[in-house]
Design a protein with these regions (language model features):
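Extended glycan-interaction surfaces of carbohydrate-active proteins
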Residues: 382-416, 442-475, 521-545, 586-723, ...
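Bacterial N-terminal signal peptides that target proteins for export
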Residues: 2-11
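Non-catalytic C-terminal accessory modules of carbohydrate-active enzymes
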Residues: 57, 68-70, 76-158, 163-169, ...
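Beta-strand-rich N-terminal accessory domains
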Residues: 26-109, 388-392, 397-399, 404-405
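Acidic/polar, glycine-enriched structural segments that form the non-catalytic walls/loops
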Residues: 27-34, 40-45, 49, 144, ...
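C-terminal substrate/ligand-recognition segments
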Residues: 178, 289-294, 301, 422-429, ...
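C-terminal motif of bacterial Sec signal peptides marking the signal peptidase cleavage site
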Residues: 21-22
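Aromatic-rich carbohydrate-recognition surfaces in CAZymes
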Residues: 91-94, 98-102, 110-121, 185, ...
């Protein structure tokens, strides 16, 4: 008898594979996420979620997609892998398997391959029972987690948050957070249960003196510090709003895993202990809230968290020999501090004051933060746009941001795993960040003060990395062309947002010093372009005029002319340079499709780079000399299509400076960027630089490509990478120019990479976590709707390519919803007041 083989399943598989292959343009279709934009995360999309909770410049902790606490960064620096053993639990009396940690299942990536996992993850709470299912919803600054388990007859919701109130920077800079645990009885009987919250004293330091202190309805994890290390001292408080809270201030003291074992034994029995505090070295603590729920009833337990770490060892920057008295006239100025101190250390004397303020003002701060949430999410904008903007507002709550006692901001570019990354409120990175100037304009203006006063010398040279504490800093390195010229445009923007003429009058002379330095240094022959080598955000110097930095130059010239005319100043010099530069950019630097760079390295004021090879002490390899002679200086882009190639016109547009360069040619450049640099699949893309931003079957926008040839052997050092901050910049600019769908394509590709499976949706990284450039995403509001408020003229501008819409706007004095209904503009105020004399419809 011959066996018959059924080939039907095999044929079906082959046909399916061929269809997938053909429908993906010759690429195997990627494993697309089930996550819908601006909606719930569940399943594997929970794995990498870590949502920052804290205050601006105050530190943070993160609420993970499961409900776990991690990234505990309250010691004035990031601690990305600091996941202390702290957890909430519920124990329902009288049922089997009724005790569980109030979290979803531990993600698989934590079980093996991370530090300590090879030894079994000792000391973590991973081994305790958890809920079968979880789902996570971000509604910044709130994160909501629903937990479900067939063993537990309760509907359970966790809500984590920290105060965030646009126009109220102080209450948005508090070292606090909260998690509300809500329980609803789904049965027809009373449910008796005990809620608990447990923690080791993760504030303790080696050779320090740590204690767990008493606090009404809670506890304080305390470290008095290590000798000669005041920055090691600090307090972390956890407390509830429940008068019946019971606290065990000292777990069982023993070896091995005795303390955690005994603590869990108590929790598991639905019991509680009330051990008093001990003098030192208590291994851990647990608070308990026993409660009874009638059928259908709901109980919410408010868990409030506060911390106080007043000292640091942070100091950056070389002191300037030029010290202007005007910088330090203010007795509250932080410039004379030996080390940085956080803003809250000047407002509160200790942890008890923070606790009292948080407890007293909790409901008011919740109401105002929830108002912002509700107004922001009351929108008709595409979900992917709202997700992108809101996800990157978390940067403001991350350790990327610091704030001095005098109120001034100082920022990193991003966060390395255990320290800030790239110091000094770097001007050419923070150029892109558009959230702060609209949500907290007064804080943003402190950055202008830093740039144009302590960071600018008498010649007008601006150090693009300011000192910490903020003080006069030596200008011994190159100025950054894009950073310094962008700062001039940002002065214009901040003036139009605030409407503060006196502020403009005061800073304008410093702005004149700055532009004159730029002209003298980079355009000494008055061509209207930057010919001399000019440092920029790619951490190299461009030699010869290029579209990117020349567009900054034109924007700065136009900004200073507009401000000068308003102040009745003579700006004819700048107007003439602008005209010459615009003509040069639109002809000499435009190849008919996009803007390019004309590489120059001979006949400049700058020394010929070939001279370096004549000095034997430089010890430069021979192959580098040959490459210079063949191609010119390293790290240029030449004939390339640069995604940032008209960046200055985008900065100008978000600042309210329109038509800096011919809009038809700008649009042509942006469409070329979309055509040549946007890749839906990067599998065949070669990147010897930093590939993990986007790689393999992921999509993304490359920084540069050379569609017409001419790629140099060593183009600028990041040219093959994908940066989210540039993706949003290009996307919002495309939208402004009427190419809305192309912009949305780029935003979707970006957010698809940050869907929680591989990357944290709330941590867009570049040179570090929570990278500031990603706040270019805030410009998507203006890009999609054309909404911009001018406080000088009290006019609301709307340039809608989409018809009727509802969106969000925040200004110096308030926030609300803005849009069009039946073709007519409207503004619905929610907080504060925005005076609108008239709407300008473009």
């Amino acid at each position: 008898m011959i066996n018959k083989i059924n080939y039907s399943p095999f044929i079906a598989v082959c046909i399916t594979a061929l269809l997938l292959f053909s429908c993906s343009g010759g690429k195997w279709q990627k494993n697309v996420s089930d996550h819908e934009y601006n909606s719930y995360y569940s399943g594997e999309n929970l794995d990498r979620i870590a949502f920052p909770i804290g205050g601006m410049g105050a530190g943070m902790f993160c609420m993970e997609g499961t409900g776990a606490i991690s990234h505990m960064s309250v010691q004035n620096r990031p601690e990305i892998y600091n996941e202390p053993c702290m957890f909430a639990a519920i124990s329902v009396k009288g049922i089997e398997n009724g005790t569980k940690v109030l979290e979803g299942q531990v993600p698989g990536w934590k079980k093996f391959g991370i530090p300590n996992s090879g030894n079994g993850s000792a000391g973590a709470s991973y081994g305790f029972p958890r809920f079968e299912n979880a789902r996570f919803l971000a509604r910044f600054p709130f994160a909501v987690i629903d937990l479900h388990d067939n063993d537990i007859p309760l509907e359970i919701t966790l809500t984590g948050w920290g105060p965030f109130i646009p126009t109220d920077p102080d209450n948005s800079s508090l070292p606090v957070g909260a998690i509300e645990y809500s329980f609803k009885n789904l049965t027809s009987k009373d449910v008796e249960a005990v809620f608990s919250y447990s923690s080791r004293n993760f504030m303790s330091q080696p050779n320090g003196n740590n204690r767990i202190k008493e606090l009404p309805e809670g506890f304080i994890l305390s470290e008095e510090g290590v000798k000669n290390k005041p920055e090691s001292a600090g307090d972390f408080a956890v407390f509830t709003n429940e008068p019946g809270t019971q606290v065990d201030y000292c777990w069982f003291r023993g070896g091995w895993w005795d303390p955690l074992t005994m603590a869990w034994n108590t929790i598991q029995k639905s019991e509680y202990k009330t051990n008093p505090p001990v003098e030192s070295r208590a291994p851990g603590t647990t608070l308990f809230v026993p409660f009874t729920l009638a059928p259908g009833d709901t109980k919410t337990i408010r868990l409030m968290i506060a911390w106080y770490v007043p000292d640091t060892n942070l100091r950056y920057g070389k002191d300037s020999e030029e010290v202007e008295n005007e910088v330090c006239e203010d007795p509250n100025c932080s410039c004379n501090l030996p080390y940085y101190k956080p803003w809250y250390s000047g407002k509160f004397a200790g942890i008890n004051e923070v606790v009292n303020y948080w407890k007293t003002n909790y409901e008011d701060l919740y109401r105002k933060s929830a108002l912002f949430r509700d107004v922001f999410y009351n929108t008709t904008l595409p979900p992917v746009v709202i997700e992108a903007i809101a996800a990157n507002l978390t940067i403001l709550k991350s350790p990327t941001v610091l704030r001095q006692p005098d109120g001034k901001l100082w920022n990193w570019e991003g966060c390395s795993d255990n320290s800030g990354c790239c110091a000094g409120s770097c001007t050419h990175v923070w150029n892109y960040a558009q959230a702060m100037p609209h949500l907290f304009p007064s804080l943003e203006r402190t950055m202008r003060h830093t740039e144009f006063y302590p960071s600018q010398d008498k010649e007008g040279h601006q150090t693009f990395r300011s000192a910490l504490p903020i003080r006069p800093v030596a200008t011994t390195f190159y100025a950054a062309s894009d950073g310094q010229l962008g700062g001039i445009m940002k002065v214009y923007r901040d003036w139009r947002i605030s409407g503060d003429d006196e502020w403009l009058k005061e800073i304008y002379p410093k702005v004149i010093e700055s532009i004159n330095y730029c002209i003298k240094t980079w355009d000494p022959r008055s061509t209207g372009t930057l010919e001399e080598p000019h440092h920029n955000t790619y951490d190299i110097e461009f030699w010869g005029p290029d579209g990117m930095c020349s567009s900054f130059y034109l924007g700065a010239l136009k900004a200073i002319s507009e401000m000068g005319i308003y102040l009745n100043e003579d700006v004819s010099k700048y107007e003439e340079l602008y005209k010459k530069g615009r003509e040069a950019m639109e002809t000499y630097l435009f190849n008919g499709e996009y803007f390019i760079q004309k590489i120059m390295w001979k006949g400049l004021n700058a020394p010929d780079p070939e001279i370096r090879f004549n000095d034997p002490n430089n010890n430069i390899p021979e192959e580098e000399r040959k490459l210079l002679i063949k191609e010119g200086p390293k790290y240029q882009y030449g004939t390339g299509c640069l995604s940032d190639g008209v960046l200055g016109t985008w900065i100008g547009a978000v600042c309210g400076l329109d038509n800096i360069v011919d809009s038809v040619k700008v649009t042509s450049h942006l469409k070329s960027v979309y055509l040549y640099n946007f890749k839906k699949n990067l599998s065949d893309h070669s990147n010897p630089q930093r590939p993990s931003y986007a790689m393999g079957d992921e999509g993304g926008l490359l920084l540069c490509s050379w569609p017409k040839g001419g790629r140099l052997s060593l183009p600028f050092v990041y040219s093959d990478e994908v940066w989210t901050g540039i993706e949003y910049q290009v996307a919002s600019h495309l939208m402004m120019m009427g190419e809305t769908e192309k912009g949305l394509d780029i935003v979707r590709a970006c957010r698809d990479r940050y869907d929680g499976r591989i990357r944290n949706p709330f941590d867009e990284y570049e040179c570090g976590h929570w990278y500031a450039r990603a706040m270019s995403s805030y410009a998507l509001l203006q890009g999609y709707t054309g909404v911009r408020y001018d406080a000088v003229t009290q006019e609301m501008h709307i340039d809608s390519h989409i018809g009727d819409f509802t969106s969000f706007i925040s200004t110096e004095t308030g926030f609300g919803n803005v849009g069009m209904r039946n073709g007519e503009p409207f503004y619905d105020g929610a907080f504060g007041e925005i005076i609108i004399r008239r709407f300008i419809m473009n």
